[in-house]
């Protein structure tokens, strides 16, 4: 019966397990209510810099 040669750290174990989800689940996107560009949920828009109705980065509305 095979035995591991050394203990695998929790970080290495979790990195390996994360690859399965990254390959199987599609990326979820939502449209920015300010400019309409597709963005990742719960993150500021890369195009206009708004999040939840407020400008959080120094970008302008036209890019």
Swiss-Prot record:
A cellular component term, taken from the record's GO annotations: large ribosomal subunit
Transmembrane segments: none
Region (Disordered): 1-27
A molecular function (GO) term: structural constituent of ribosome
Biased composition (Basic residues): 7-18
Domain of life: Bacteria
An example Gene Ontology biological process: translation
InterPro entries: Ribosomal_bL32, Ribosomal_bL32_bact, Ribosomal_zn-bd
Key words of the record: Ribonucleoprotein, Ribosomal protein
Family of the protein in this entry: Belongs to the bacterial ribosomal protein bL32 family.
Protein's recorded name: Large ribosomal subunit protein bL32
Gene, per the UniProt record: rpmF
């Amino acid at each position: 019966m095979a035995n591991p040669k050394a203990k695998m750290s929790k970080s290495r174990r979790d990195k390996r397990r994360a690859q399965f989800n990254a390959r199987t689940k599609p990326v979820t996107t939502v449209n920015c209510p300010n400019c309409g560009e597709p963005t990742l949920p719960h993150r500021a828009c890369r195009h206009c810099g708004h999040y939840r109705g407020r400008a959080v980065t120094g970008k302008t509305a036209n890019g």
